[in-house]
Amino acid sequence: MSDYIVVKCGGSMLDQLNDVFFDCIKKLQQKYKVVIVHGGGPEIDAKLKDCNIKVEKRDGLRVTPREVMDIVQMVLCGSTNKKLVMNLQKHNLLAVGCSGCDGNLLQVQPVSKEIGYVGEVSYVETALLKGLINMNYIPVIAPIGINENEIYNINADNAAAGIAAALSAKELIFITDVDGILHEGKLVKKTDEFEIDTFIEKGVITGGMIPKVQAALASLKMGVQKVSVVNGTKDFAEVTGECIGTTVTKGVNIV
């Protein structure tokens, strides 16, 4: 069984992370080898508005022409990545920040010409991640990738799923500001790919949770053992290394 865990933290969560989150990362690190992938959407939006550049998304993906890609790269690889690295180290968690173009870490296939420099993960150079982890660092990855010497923006959920699949990770953890997937106000503690599809069809899962569960299902199909959706502002990791939230597994129909 793989002992890797990938933690995905969206850009909207980065400013909400508190001591509890970092304590949970410490608990996970005692049991597993941890990789963190982050987003940066709100800061990118703010910087684009400062530059009088239109913020545009299609099907949940940021339309990324060259001038937008330059700002995406600046934010994700610069201030956002380094802020998270410094916060980890402030809590005595040694971390190294890098992007998917460093060491050819994340190679991508372009999604479509219509949305510009946006790619989906096609290959992960896991040797770089494993090398950093073996030196007791937590890799902190900005979701930028490369294709034919061009830099591409990657949806952070897709980047995390791709990395988790390449590592055959034990678990992919999505950090959110809710306790997990909720149905009629109650937490769904365990679910699977069949029930997830039903939840989407019935409108139980909406908005920003949809790309997360879609990435979760994709990573399960690629070999990740389970996916958890947790509240990053609460204690989501037990001392056993198990997560408190919604756990999604493959092919166990519990409906």
Curated annotation (Swiss-Prot):
InterPro entries listed in its UniProt record: AceGlu_kinase-like_sf, AcgluKinase_fam, ArgB, Asp/Glu/Uridylate_kinase
Entry keywords, A to Z: Amino-acid biosynthesis, Arginine biosynthesis, ATP-binding, Cytoplasm, Kinase, Nucleotide-binding, Transferase
Pfam families, per the entry: AA_kinase
Site (Transition state stabilizer): 8, 212
Similarity comment: family membership: Belongs to the acetylglutamate kinase family. ArgB subfamily.
Record's function text: Catalyzes the ATP-dependent phosphorylation of N-acetyl-L-glutamate.
Stated name of the protein: Acetylglutamate kinase
